[in-house]
Amino acid sequence: MTYQATNEAADADGAEWVPWREATERALYGPRGFYRRPEGPAGHFRTSVHASPLYAAAVARLLTETAEGLPARVSEVALVDVGAGRGELLTGVLAALPDGFPVRAYAVERAARPAGLDPRIEWGERPPSGVSGLLFANEWLDNVPVDVAETDDAGVRRYVLVRADGEERLGGPVAGADAAWLDRWWPTAGPGARAEIGRPRDEAWAAAVAGLESGLAVAVDYAHRAGDRPPFGTLTGFSGGREVRPVPDGGCDITAHVALDACAGPGAELVSQRDALRRLGISGARPPLALASSDPAAYVRALASAGEAAELTARGGLGDFTWLFQPVPAG
């Protein structure tokens, strides 16, 4: 345990009080956890991967661009999808790549390999090491469990403890590495203010990136930066396509926005999804009206594609996600 509770660890009726990080780990990844369910994330919410095949096409283009900058000795280009869900993104990228492109695809996911998945996709719980290419993590870091801190009336930051029914109370003071992280990345805003302690995410990201010998690592998530942290945190739940109260009983996703600036290493760049996809040729621009006369079928296809691109880049929606580009120079 990284805390000392101000009360007993369990109520008289046996209800256990634990920090949010521990509760989330059980609720998402335990034997009956939310992410162990057969339907997977797609059964409860829609990510950019599910919104349009254009997203996979953009990642395929990013992979080919990354491959051009790899050392000549690299004969096989790795594509590592961290938090792969049921393999939807990798399946789409493999379909979008040019014929004969020398890719080796890795899905990193704690759930079991789905039946019928493309046999070219290797499945495991940990990122590979010693590979060169593109590591891509779409909405992974927000599901790396973190502890929650709340400032009490005396100005002391304390761990928030939670029961399986979602009820909360304050525990012991935040100390050690967690306190240092808050001091550096999310200073207190006064009594009642809350913060998610992102240190485990920083460490998870650094460990994933360390597996690349050369190439590019990209994390995509809803995020915030220093100077723009939400005063009461962002911890929430999702189930059946709706935002719900976060209850760590395995019945809903539990997530919180990511302090991506804290994850960023030397040479990293943070850009909006809108700008990132535009760099990769996804803009949402409507096709010229003249095409409707010269080639009506092509115009209809282009119009549909523009609509999908507009959703991926929309302000106030998916376009506001943040992309962290972390280059990994060859050693």
Predicted regions and their residues:
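Short helix/loop capping segments that flank catalytic or ligand/cofactor-binding pockets
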Residues: 36, 144-146, 228
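A mobile, often basic/glycine-rich helix-loop segment
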Residues: 134-186, 232-240
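Conserved acidic residues
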Residues: 132-133, 215
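Rossmann-like AdoMet
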Residues: 1-126, 131, 149, 275, ...
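Gly/Ser/Thr-rich loops at beta-strand to alpha-helix junctions
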Residues: 85-88, 142, 224-225
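Long, Lys/Arg- and hydrophobic-enriched amphipathic alpha-helices
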Residues: 179-331
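Active-site flanking residues adjacent to catalytic metal/cofactor-binding acidic residues
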Residues: 80, 108, 135-138, 220
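A short, conserved alpha-helix within the catalytic core of class I
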Residues: 124-126, 141-156, 197-207
